[in-house]
Amino acid sequence: MTSWLPQNLQKRLLLYTIKQVSLFSNVDVSNLDVSIGSQSHFGFTDIDLNVCEINLPNIEVLSGRISKLNLQLAVAGNVEISGEGMVFVLKPADGFFDDDSSEQWASSLTKSVMDMTKSILDTELSEYQSKIYKDTNEDIKPPTALDSMMDKVLRVALSKLTINLKNVELQLIISPELMLKISISEVKMISADEKRIADVIGVSAVFSKPEQSVPSYGSSSSDKEDDNTSDSEDPLSTSITYSKLEATSIYLSAMESLVLDSLDGETYQFLNIDKIEVQFQGITSINDLKVHDLKIKINALDIHLENVSSILSHIMSLLNHVQLSNSEDKIRTQELKSYKRFQHEQNIEEDKTLTFVLLNSLKFHLRDNLFIMLTEISLNSSVSPYTSVSISDIQLVLDSKEYINRSDSSEPFLSLNKNSSTSEQKLHLNRDIKVEVDYSLMKQLILFANDYMCLYNQIIERPSTYADPSADPKFLLSSQNVCFLLNLGDLIMEFHFSPFFSNIPHTTFKIPKLSIFSVQNNEKSHIGELTDFEFHSRKSGCFNISGANSKFCASNVNTKTKATLENLEVSILESDMNKIIQCLSGVLGSLPELLLSSGETTSSKNMEKRSVRMMQSSAFLHNRTALSMFCVQINCMKIKISNISGKAFGDLMITARKSLIYQDKYSDLSISFTEFTAQRQYRSEKTDIIFDINHDSNIANFVINRTKVGKIKAYLTGVGIFIHTKWSELFSGQKTENSINEQKKNAKTLVSIPIDIKLYDCALSLKPCRLSTGLAINIPRAQINITKNEITLSTKILDLLLIDDMNLIHETDLGHTTSTSNWYEKQGYSSLVKIDTLSVRFCPGGVASTRVNVHKIDSSICSDSFNALIQTIIDLKPVVTYPENVKYQLEPELVSVFEDLTDQYFTTARISENDLEIYPDTYSNSGESLVFEENYFSPKLESPSKNEVNMAVFEILSNVKISVDEIKLKLYDGYDWKHTRKEINSAVEQLEENFKDGLSCPDAKVFDSIYIPAPRDEDENIKSNINMKIHNEETKEGKMKLRPTKKYKILIQGNGIKVNIQSGNDELRTTSTLPLSDNTYDILNETSVQINNLEIVDNLPTSTWNKFLTRTKLKTTNTLQQSPMFSLRFTMIRPTPHLYATELIFSVHVKPISLHVDQDALEFLTLFFQFKDPRFELIDDYPDIPYIQRFEINSVKILLDYKPKKVDYVGLRSGKTKEFMNFFILDQAKINLKHVILYGIDGFSRLETILTDIWTPDITKTQLPGILGALTPFKPFAGLSYGARALVSVPTEQYQQSGRLGTSLQKGGMVFLRTTGGEFVKLAVRLTSGTQTILESTEKLLGGQGSNGRNIKIKLVEGDEIVDAFIDESILRSTTLFDNTANDNNHLDVILPQGDTQKVISLYADQPKDFYSGLHDAYSSFGRNLNITFDSMKQAKNDIKTANGAQEAVSTVAKAAPLALIRPLIGVTEALSKTLQGLNNQYDQEEIAHIEEKYKSSN
């Protein structure tokens, strides 16, 4: 065109031409500047692009505006394009997941180029255009001559293309709350031959949170309709007339203004690039728009990740959609595999799009002042099919401090080689590196990780698509030596990694060796070593790992990430370990809070799913399956802590096998150990501290769970813990003043994280300080809860087992037993105590409070095991003794009288006469007399006790309350320990050997309680006597039965036991802090014991009495009856606060008690508690006898029944007057032990002697008549005398009160009749019972059945077996241990068999409750005796018939005649006795309760 055309017509022609280009269809003629000629110039201002014609993949263009655009065209073919102020507003497309979205970009670009070419050639291409845009399924016709001409023109134009754009801006609306703004300062591109060179300057990306929400814009349907109908109108007339898109332009302008205004809100810098240099080849024709041989050079790239964390949630959904779209694209690219294979077979190489990239500096800003910088990053893919990437250097900088050090080398820091033909990638770390981490860096990294944890979780949770395993890329990683330094202030931890490698998909990551060192004061120590660490990860599928859950059942752990460690060995000194722990706690103390703030989830789904595995059979195995984020397996872990407590403790070796650590996606962490043991190694001695008990080694026995809320749960099964109480002395000396102060400071807080511990079949073994015994506490099931303010323990059953010598533990293969108690019993332990339902609650604070509640304690014990148990419990507390010089003040203090006086105090040498004032004499003018005040100098007398109480200092620090509902102590005869039985056997054999050799045989005494008399003749068998004493049965000669009896002999039962212990400060006070008074003392602790009810049950087979001790039944109210039967309060004080000497103060209160004392039971109890084994004697370095400062006991009323069995005549001849008591039987003797207060007593043995010396004379002087009245022969007469006395005393008292003589005489008579009548009946019962016994003994002597004829059916004390009664005169003798003297006091007893023992039942037992029952029992007993007579006569008749001669017949008649006469008499006496007993009990109901408590029952 020439310049003679009018300007208006040139604009109209240009407008018509440009509108043929789809992007510029909205151009207005008023915004055009046209100059057409050899150097044509086209100028555009304020262009609104037709964004409906722009189709980008997954992106919708909302608006496009160009402020200024210039186009210069030369006839020679040069094309220059310059623009300024380009703004595009975009958003994610609505059809984001459409499969053909990626093809829309190529179609839009091709259409725009075609429109531009058509406008330049000024030809009609409508027909050709229609052919271009036919469906892709139609065949494409070969190019025409016109097509070739167009392609040639385009090549010339593109070869001389120059572009210069300024102020380019892209605004991407990610969501209504978030926008991304990308700004480019300048874009320059020039063309030289086939090369294109472009420079992009000043690229920045900013995220913005608009102050107002940005609406979503899309192309309306009306716009599309207008666009579709535009071709039907006349193009030229349309261009000349007013543009119909003016309204749309106005709308877009308003929308753009709204978007720009929204950028005034809060902005976040994301990316900065100072300059990008791009060089490429391509875009030469309309049919070849490909770009190849692309080379990019970037000077500096800054990525600000610290600003992205706050808006990360908004863009994650967009990234997820992009990921899903890319995955679909990858699936579609699988269709080109056959084509790629064809190219490979034909050796046809494709032109590479990207051949070289150089990035001088890449800086990731993680957080404030923390960044990672990579320098000289280069990518080279010029040589096909290889691609190499290298990083020259890497830096990690925080606050201008660099944390990564590299070795010097000419090679790049990191290099990556990729082979596209084999999909193999090789990454090499070419330098030795050293990474240092301190608290500041670790804190910033954890905060950064917390910010991006959601991104990691979404990557893990992203659904994986199926891919061909053969198509997985191969990745090889190798490195040089890596050193990781953890700076903890005064300590540096070094981790040295050997060259590690990775081989994906086989091994994700592997470290052959990792060595750990500690550096203190420039001294380097080797701590531990890890070998064969492997890390595996899967994109699809999961690793299935066998584990265990909290119920110790098999569980499967499914995870995509797994780490395996073959061996972990740590060897460290205790001092170094303490230093490391101190540094870690100080430096990393706040890190757990940072970690807890990450990974918050809201899902409440069950973490475990049930999986079913089908076996070959029809059985199904159900295992729990846990989904985890990662899993770590440690096959073997060994930790050795040396020189504990300064070599005094030795070394501690901790071993764990088959350890499993995993965390689920809800941040619950689980740790399990299959074998976890700890062993102490001291010189050549090895002691197991933590060990397996009766546990299968294939099942985990230690599981720890840490929930996302921070609660720790521990589960233990089959775990035993051994503690030697002497170890506390080793560690107590290691406590420094700072550690003690720290403990006091944190005394109110136990733990910061709640801990729950559950125990299943576990045990705690304790060894005392000085003894060789061992105490084991079996815990079948228990739960321990530890919170910030308290510790609670609850269990249903506890079993206490004891062994007398731990050196005698059987080292045999125990295998798997039925219970933990059996496991210990096989080792030689003996079960002694069982505790039912125990609960403990401990609360720290100013006053530490402990509450212990026990439902029932049941103990079955022998004398030797009881002695061992008591001594063991005493010895469990560490021994604390002091020499005399620190307990007492052995030397008086020297007091200087004149210390506070000056030397010149009493001299007048320095007094001047001028200093003396002379006062004149004064006299009283009045004649008043002097008045003297008496008692002016007399001090006020105060109670010493009050002064002492006021001067006592008791600062309570802890309070322990123990409550026991019921306790049973069953005392067995026999001996538990093999050593005891062996000593008795040796003593007996020595006596027998000496007797056979004719040597003198003095009596032997074993264990201070077992007396073995020497044999008096050859017929006496010591072993048989011992067996008779213990088991009440004779055995074969030469065999002794010393094991415990099957039934207990004494039962001590207590109910409602309460113990309250208050402890104070036991530290010495210095003399400077003491008050002036000498009466000041410190109270160390105060203990009170209350027992509501205490009973001792007599179960000896030779005793007829039931309860040895019980509460006296008083005719009082129930409230008084419920008061404690026994109360004890004792206080330990320190009389001199600056000395270690202590004293005791006792106060005892006992309610009235009843004693039914059988001499055999008394002797058994005495010998039981006197047993002393020299092995269990506690010897202190400084023996201390307890000094009792004050002892007080109230007046005790005793109702005593006493039945002697034998008399010690030897002791009687030696002056023991107590033996006179064994001549008499006492029945309800009333004894009152008077109130006693004692001061200054040395030891408890001395206390016993003093009390005996006080009470015995008082009883003999003031209470002898009452005791004599309780003697059995005089008891009836004493009752009759009391009745006669009541006949006078009662009327007199009643007459004095009421004044009525008749009523008084009536009451007196009633008392007389009731008393005398009852005593007459009792006397008759005694006479009839005595007569029955005499008749039965006579019958027995004459060959009859004797007491066997009663035929009483009884129940055993601890069984349901029914046996028949029998009598054996030979065992009516004394049953003392080695004395066969006849016993005449058993004439009213009958012996009944009871398993391995024989039970004796008195004739006074099982009395009828009323007169009717007495008649019924009398009738039954009389009939039974007549039947016995009839049977004996019938038997005699049969014997006479079968007799061989008259002499034998007469002998049979002589034997049967007395029996026939005596047995009916026995029946009469027994019937009369039962009748009288029923009559007596009819009028005295209290006698029934007394009989039931006193006598054993046959029922």
Swiss-Prot record:
Ranges of Acidic residues composition bias in the record: 224-234
BP terms from Gene Ontology: autophagosome assembly; autophagy of mitochondrion; glycophagy; lipid transport; piecemeal microautophagy of the nucleus; protein transport; reticulophagy
Domain of life: Eukaryota
Catalytic activity annotation: a 1,2-diacyl-sn-glycero-3-phosphocholine(in) = a 1,2-diacyl-sn-glycero-3-phosphocholine(out); a 1,2-diacyl-sn-glycero-3-phospho-L-serine(in) = a 1,2-diacyl-sn-glycero-3-phospho-L-serine(out); a 1,2-diacyl-sn-glycero-3-phosphoethanolamine(in) = a 1,2-diacyl-sn-glycero-3-phosphoethanolamine(out)
Compartment annotation: Preautophagosomal structure membrane; Endoplasmic reticulum membrane
Record-level Gene Ontology MF annotations: phosphatidylinositol-3-phosphate binding; protein-membrane adaptor activity
Disruption phenotype: Still forms preautophagosomal structures (PAS) in proximity to the vacuolar membrane.
Residue ranges of the TM segments: none
GO cellular component entries: endoplasmic reticulum membrane; phagophore; phagophore assembly site membrane
Biased composition (Polar residues): 211-221
Alphabetical list of InterPro entries matching this protein: ATG2
Membrane topology reported for the UniProt record: Peripheral membrane protein
Any Pfam family matching the protein: ATG2_CAD
Note: Kluyveromyces marxianus proteins are shorter in length and have a more ordered secondary structure than their S.cerevisiae counterparts, which might contribute to the superior thermotolerance and solubility. K.marxianus could be therefore useful as a new model organism for further elucidation of the molecular details of autophagy.
Function in brief: Lipid transfer protein required for autophagosome completion and peroxisome degradation. Tethers the edge of the isolation membrane (IM) to the endoplasmic reticulum (ER) and mediates direct lipid transfer from ER to IM for IM expansion. ATG2 binds to the ER exit site (ERES), which is the membrane source for autophagosome formation, using basic residues in its N-terminal region (NR) and to the expanding edge of the IM through its C-terminal region. The latter binding is assisted by an ATG18-PtdIns3P interaction.
Family under the similarity heading: Belongs to the ATG2 family.
Protein name: Autophagy-related protein 2
Organism: Kluyveromyces marxianus (strain DMKU3-1042 / BCC 29191 / NBRC 104275) (Yeast)
